[in-house]
């Protein structure tokens, strides 16, 4: 006993320090060395020692026999358990320390500090007597219950403090003194339940998630909201909380998608206040819903998350859309004949309705009732759709309030659901009614929409009023097929809302769980059918709302079309041509968006029967258009936007499907406007008049759009194409639809208005959602004027930026030729005038690129920024979509922030800017964590094969950092240019702005300043890191002058892309090249680019030219297309230019600031400078065309010089001064870099000798 006593005394003396340190070491070893071999060896030794020590040290304690028993049996169990955990070492050491610790704890109550490991704790706990364990287990349960009653969760303590056998802290407390924090918590001090964030290390919150679209704050808030919503105690309030949760989630996802797609989310910021704003602020719901649909469309077009977004979020809209889509899709896919399509539609309608239980009843009931109430149902449905579409104000108020509630509550989905449901129910009603009384549906649709608009307005109002309550009830009230058309439309729309909401947010919302079930089934089936359709189906999903309107209608139209044609001929004979044209346009959009088969059918709008579903959709669209025709301009604009959407969708595949939906939505929106105008009128006559006028305008729109779609053969009717072409030339190319129409019918409509079709090359450009742009080469000037007029007149506060050059699509080459023609039409590209591409693009980069920052390496973020949101995406279409969507958003916000502020809550812009700030700060944090070369001796590192092998990585890092820095510099310059242009534009309208708008302008200005400052800080950090990396690379790269040139060549070639020279030996050559480059840049910047830009309006030209000069001359991460986009010159402005955009689309050039040949063009040299050998070697082949392209552009600018007005001459002088300043700054920066290169090279040479000496020392 003496020995044990002495050992126990020693152990007691050791315990608090040595034992703790020993346990720490053991735990560290367990953690660090997971190899079984090491741990087993150590564990065996330690186990033997531990058992001895356990026996010896436990003897003196009061628990000697128990300790001895534990030393044998429990330790074995622990060892087995630890072996299972692959921590035998920890087990043995833990046993060793735990036995002593246990004795000490029992005796001294000493604290083991915080280094108790699971293994150690497990050992210690297992050591406790079996009786104690049993008692502890019982106590654990009781105390666990007590703790739970107290609101304390034993999860963290139990998992952290106990092995697995001990389940509660109370058990541990009996064994030893608990952690003081736990004791205090148990005693009631502090919060009973520490904040979740307090238990999560701050490192998880310091930087945003690298995953795509993950925001921890949004996630946590959504989880908390969901917990609250799911709490049964909330009862009724939980429903409304669900709405809020849905709104929040939808807002978050919308913002995320807007970042990805670059589309503006105008109402996202007001989502929280949407509940109050829903009724009062219908436009925000429109914006939000439109944003959601637009985002889905954009995503489907971009193919970024087509399956996920469309099937995930659009899945909720798909129920109604699924009806129409399944019907349409199945009809389109399965139906060979209209009759077959009709029967299939009927069958599928029934199937889809059965799939959608609520909708089924509604559909079946509506179809049954539609036979009787076909007119009323269709009127009600159509009134719902048309009310949604037609009563813009009322619907925007009621429907938007209703839908905004839904859209905001259920997020984007519900607004879609309303419109979709109305559309789908309408289409279903139309299907049934059209099947039964097609003629009625068609003629009555037209009159009914206006007639039913008031009643529907009431119905919609009822829906709106009862929506939140009925939102829950909407799933319950599945008897919407009640004879009351209102109820049908309402219940259907509500059910659709609920269905969509349920499908999208079934977890959190629980709105229409039944509906959700139906939705999920239907949605799945629909998605399957849509999947069969392909991306068009996806787009259909995302655009279900519009699709339901268009496709559902189209689906019944198959049956209804012949009748409709008849009825149309009967009631719309005079309008038939216009309707056919409008239908052709709608069909065009629809077919373009849905399918080319449908497009063909639509093309045969004259023979609308050819494709029943497209025709029907066209018919309905026509009717909607008829209703909308009072808002013909808007409708046309939106149709044009829809057409541009169709063009985009057709370009991107079946996105066209979405387009036609959008078209219809636009038509519905316009119909709403027209309904507003003829709200009280029965509408059949007014709808007819509207149809006549609207059809004419639609024809004009179609013509303008047809120019763009000429090659699409969407409309086969040559008359329509010719007329559209003529109309396009007639000056209808640019129409501005009113700012986002009501959300209910089609958020997509807003999307439609957002889309801008640029040139006949099918290139589509997304402009701010409020605008629909028809882009025809000859009309661009008129469009500019009109756009300016529209901007001045319309309340829409987005600017029309039609920069064909900004559209970067694979089809761009095709459209480049027409663009060249446009440029040759004698007018400067309107794009540059309307919206300085640099502005739009830098803004784009602000919004769309920053959204991608988290997904990409920091260097790539800056790269994309500099390239104006031309991400390093291999797919040209992706980048094309990204830029158009991003640019328009930036356009409207950047150029006309005041407008954006007035119409759209500044929150959207602020959110974008704040996101940019957040991303920049994240980039700063990430940069601070950016891996630097780590090595005990960087100088000697090159001599180790491992280091040399890693060197290329650091070289790439160095290059990327340089590229990032230059990109940031360029981006910041572009931001400044944008701000200058914005300020110039604002000065003209600032005195017209309201106080709120001015406040928003000031606020946005502050945000932009913050962004610029953050960018500057980021540049500084990048510069510092570059210097550090450069030093390390130099040391590694040139350990000694005798070092083999292979390593230097490897490193140097990689860094050649950077201004840094691979080695001091090559410094002079790059220096000479840099000086020559600067001379070229000076001459070209001062003369060519400055003069080029002066064609652009001074406010914008200076910025665009300035930024272009900087970007092109410095060639900061910019390809030739970058310059083109910057200048806003169509990508085909010159033959050389047309080549460069293609190259840019194919690759994103990463070039040093002044070294890349992408500078306007050095007339004589097509060769890339030697320092471009590195990463530019790949691009060398493209470098020549780039050089030629900018050169041609510069020459073109010179050629245009003579035509510049005197005022522009003066402005030119100012620009010249600015350009001279830029040149000086560039020269200074280059000279400084060259000096740093030389100095660093010399230092490297010196350090290399030292390195060789040190190497000798080491070896």
UniProtKB/Swiss-Prot annotation:
Species of origin: Homo sapiens (Human)
Name of the protein in question: Protein ITPRID2
Post-translational events: A 33 kDa peptide corresponding to the C-terminus of this protein is found in the testis and seems to be cleaved into 2 peptides of 14 kDa and 18 kDa found on the surface of mature sperm cells. This sperm surface antigen may be involved in some step of early cleavage of the fertilized oocyte.
InterPro entries for the chain: ITPR-bd, SSFA2_C, TESPA1-like
Compartments, record wording: Cytoplasm
Residues in coiled coil: 959-1037
Primary localization class, coarse: cytoplasm
GO molecular function: actin filament binding; signaling receptor binding
Signal peptide (from-to): none
Compositionally skewed regions (Acidic residues) per UniProt: 38-59
Induction per the UniProt record: Up-regulated by activated KRAS.
Keyword flag Phosphoprotein: yes
Glycyl lysine isopeptide (Lys-Gly) (interchain with G-Cter in SUMO2) crosslink residues: 360, 808
Keyword Transport tagged: no
Tissue expression notes: Strongly expressed in pancreas and testis. Present in colon cancer cells (at protein level).
Compositionally biased spans, kind Polar residues: 268-277, 382-393, 1101-1118, 1158-1168
Region ranges (Disordered): 31-72, 268-290, 306-450, 806-829, 1094-1137, 1154-1215
Pfam families per record: KRAP_IP3R_bind, SSFA2_C
